[in-house]
């Protein structure tokens, strides 16, 4: 199997040669560069002057005069502007979610070069001057008409009044916010993108050639950026696709574009591929394809040892399987821990590259217990702690590991019915003295939490020599928690975050509960365990995808937004159709070069899972030329 990155490395070396020092290779994400560098080194028996590797977001950051704003600070700055413009009395913790949403909308506005004044104009004005919108095509005009049919300005309700009132302020908030951020020398990503595009001078760029590899959906800024560099003779483009989904007609009624190939076809027309079409006909080549239904999520994880043995056995003796040619792709990241527990000992190396919910780690429950202890669990008027808050801390595994007195103290408090113990009763060793010292003020609370996390770090340092995959994961969760709390502490100490301790409690809990750990290992070694997004540009010989259910791929529902769907569509912004097409591309692109493909889905209906296979599986079942084996898991055995 020849991978896409191998093809690119081979072609680029033939065209440019050994000296790639004046070349920047741009990927959608940084991960692919590690694989690519290995393939590039194989092209020559002599030393190669290495190119620069950069992700698209890093490239725009390098070209921007501003620093990337800390996400928490960005919301805090928006909160100040929001209160000034609306005279709202909303608290920061109530605003925080809406603030993230608004920044996401502004980000999309800028990345798609939307005229913010027109978008956020008074809705009545927008309706009145709709006919003058020459920049809209017929489809966009229809989207605006549908919006006003469904959203009658004349029929006012309390909810509509609130929406219209806020909408009329969004333009002022947008401009005021961007002005304030520029004054501070920081920006959100879309603001950087727009500025770089508007001020771009290709002849002043650092590198002679910019090689764009493996992109799919492009926003307006990226498209314009690519065009400017192509016109300046500085750009090369490598697109990955398969003729199966760029040529496939549906019901013989052209024009029809397969969902997975919709954006690639647009890109190929504007930016021709450096590679010939002949190398992109692999999806129709012989493959072993299996669809397996499972009764539960965990049953899929327990099937892994059998799958690993089957792909190892299938290989010929003269071509033994390499672990890095095997990939376990999780459509549901909550399956990571069951999957790690299920990997057999014969797998020597495992590399995890995916986001994992911080809320599913021991560090999260420990920090949450400490926050409750020092806020709602401590009565400042009596100087006593609440028993339930104390018990949660004493029973936690981290406390038991760091304190020899914790277990005995917990039993004593229970036996003596000490429902409101004094701090002095609880300080029975050095660690417990740190834990049960009351903290007042938001800065003191954050400092306390970082000190506690440093104590926990000692535990993981002691176990570091074992190189256990779970310890690696928990160390990442510790670092993520420490970084997040320390960022808040810096904002507080710099006077940029001035809130009540109860607001800080809710804000901390919200931030920790919604955070993901960006877990990164050594990608060029071992079996790969990853999420769907992390598979971009990578190819694997043996592939298993878990939780390939409708609702998991593509994810159920669209992203929340202040900007209604029809207006997003009319102004050329990102919509749910874009995201579904992106996931369709990820699915087909991942399968196209694999030789052994096993797709599992859960038949139980719970949460996001509807108990049915993903639409992409159904589509592949109907359209693909392969004979697909349909099986089911029963008591851990495939039947």
Locations of the language-model features?
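Nucleic acid-machinery interaction/catalytic patches
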Residues: 1-568, 625-631, 635
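Accessory/regulatory regions of helicases
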Residues: 365, 388, 392, 549-639
């Amino acid at each position: 199997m020849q991978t896409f990155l191998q093809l690119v490395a081979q072609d680029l070396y033939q065209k440019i040669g050994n000296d790639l020092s004046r070349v920047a290779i741009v990927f959608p994400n940084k991960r692919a560069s590690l694989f690519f560098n290995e393939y590039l080194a194989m092209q020559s028996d002599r030393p190669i002057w290495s190119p620069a590797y950069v992700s698209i977001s890093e490239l725009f950051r390098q070209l921007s005069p501003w620093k990337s704003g800390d996400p928490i600070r960005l919301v805090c700055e928006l909160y100040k502007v929001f209160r000034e413009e609306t005279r709202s009395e909303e608290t920061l913790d109530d605003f925080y979610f809406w603030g993230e949403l608004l920044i996401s909308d502004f980000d999309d506005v800028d990345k798609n070069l939307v005229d913010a004044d027109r978008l956020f104009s008074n809705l009545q004005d927008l309706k009145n001057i709709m006919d003058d919108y020459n920049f809209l095509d017929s489809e966009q005009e229809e989207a605006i008409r549908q919006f006003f049919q469904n959203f009658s300005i004349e029929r006012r309700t309390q909810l509509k009044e609130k929406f219209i009132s806020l909408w009329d302020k969004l333009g002022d908030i947008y401009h005021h916010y961007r002005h304030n951020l520029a004054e501070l020398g920081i920006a959100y990503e879309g603001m950087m993108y727009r500025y770089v595009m508007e001020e771009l001078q290709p002849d002043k760029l650092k590198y002679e050639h910019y090689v764009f590899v493996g992109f799919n959906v492009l926003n307006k800024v990226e498209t314009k950026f690519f065009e400017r560099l192509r016109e300046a003779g500085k750009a090369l483009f490598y697109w990955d696709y398969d003729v199966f989904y760029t040529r496939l007609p549906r019901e013989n009624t052209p024009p029809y574009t397969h969902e997975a190939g919709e954006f690639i076809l647009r890109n190929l027309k504007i930016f021709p591929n450096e590679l010939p079409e002949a190398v992109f006909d692999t999806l129709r080549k012989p493959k072993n394809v299996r669809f397996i239904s499972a009764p539960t999520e965990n049953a899929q994880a327990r099937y892994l040892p059998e799958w690993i043995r089957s792909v190892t056995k299938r290989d010929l003796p003269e071509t033994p399987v390499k672990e890095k040619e095997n990939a376990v792709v999780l459509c549901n990241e909550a399956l990571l821990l069951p999957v790690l527990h299920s990997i057999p000992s014969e797998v020597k190396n495992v590399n995890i590259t995916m986001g994992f919910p911080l809320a599913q780690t021991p560090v999260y429950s420990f920090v949450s217990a400490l926050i409750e202890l020092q806020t709602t669990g401590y009565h400042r008027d009596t100087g006593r702690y609440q028993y339930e808050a104390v018990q949660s801390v004493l029973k936690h595994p981290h406390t038991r590991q760091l304190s020899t007195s914790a277990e005995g103290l917990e039993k004593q408090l229970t036996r003596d019915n000490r429902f409101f113990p004094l701090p002095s009763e609880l300080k029975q060793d050095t660690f417990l003295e740190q834990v049960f010292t009351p903290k007042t003020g938001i800065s003191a609370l954050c400092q306390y939490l970082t000190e506690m996390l440093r104590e926990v770090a000692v535990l993981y340092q002691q176990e570091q020599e074992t190189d256990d995959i779970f310890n690696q994961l928990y160390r990442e969760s510790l670092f993520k928690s420490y970084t997040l709390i320390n960022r808040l502490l810096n904002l507080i100490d710099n006077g940029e975050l001035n809130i009540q301790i109860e607001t800080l409690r809710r804000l901390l809990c919200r931030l920790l509960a919604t955070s993901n750990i960006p877990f990164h290992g050594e990608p060029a070694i071992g079996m790969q365990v990853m999420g769907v997004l992390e598979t971009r540009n990578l190819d694997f010989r043996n592939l298993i995808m878990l939780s390939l259910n409708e609702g998991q791929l593509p994810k159920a529902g669209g992203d929340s937004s202040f900007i209604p769907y029809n207006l997003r569509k009319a102004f050329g912004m990102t919509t749910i159709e874009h995201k579904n097409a992106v996931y369709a591309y990820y699915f087909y692109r991942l399968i196209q070069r694999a030789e052994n493909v096993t797709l599992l889905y859960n038949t139980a209906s719970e949460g996001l899972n509807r108990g049915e296979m993903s639409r992409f599986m159904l589509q592949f079942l109907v359209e693909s030329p392969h004979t697909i084996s349909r099986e089911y898991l029963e008591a851990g055995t495939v039947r």
